[in-house]
Structure formats: C-alpha cells, structure tokens
C-alpha cells in the first residue's frame, strides 16, 4: 500500500524534523531562520535583509504538512507524533494582513524592497497549497491584493503560478 509503506514514512520523518526545528516566539511556534525565496525586506532602519523568522511560505507549508500527517494518522490508525503534531499545528502563527491589505510575506509587516518581485511564495497557502480556504474572504482578498501589487511581470513559470492563483480566486 503506497500510503502506508511509502508516503507515511517520508511524511512522518518530515514532521519529526520540523517538530524539532520549530522554536517558540511570541507564543507561537515559528521557523527560524526563514526566508521568502529571492525576496528581501527593509527593517525599521531601512536596511535590506532576506533572513528573518516565520515566513508565510514556511508557515503555509507546515500547516499543510501537519494537517496532512494528521489525516494519514487517522486513515492508518497510527498515533506516532500525533499529539505533538496537533499541538504544533495549533501553535503555528496565523496568517496576517499587511499595511496595504496584502497577505504579509513575513511574520512582521516589513516593506518589500521590490513589490513587483516575480515570486509569490507567500501565496503558497492559496495555491498550490490549500490552507487558505474558499470561505475565508478576508484572506482571499489579501491574496488578491498581493497579486495586484506584484503585477503581471515575470518569467514563464511564475506567470503560470499567478494564473493558477487567479483561477483559485475564481478571477482568472
């Protein structure tokens, strides 16, 4: 059985790794260090950085990973790491809406150095992930604002991703 013999062991070990990697900050479990691929931000002093903690992409992937793992545990009737995973999933930070109404790319509401950057990694939770639900109008609106801010520039692969995001928003 693929789920039991192949997928479960790989996903279980990914969960085990991240349970050990997460660190507590501000009452949440966060990834640290963390980046949003190829994008940078300005700190309060106006200095450019790329490394911080709890990027939205990281948190999106972990929410999806942990939820998937818990579903697999129920299907296979196993409970290895189940309680720890349930706890960690509840302790991941919520998605945040930033200063311009966009989905924040990082835990803090930093200013991007390039708002038109081709990467939309912080929208992973909408697509290809599924942790931003169709019923969550506030987050969907924030994703739409993020897409509009980024614009339509980019290379082939990111244009396909943006088109898929628009389709997920039922606006493609």
Regions found by a protein language model. Name each.
Residues 1, 5-9, 13, 55-172:
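Active-site core of glycosidic bond-cleaving carbohydrate-active enzymes
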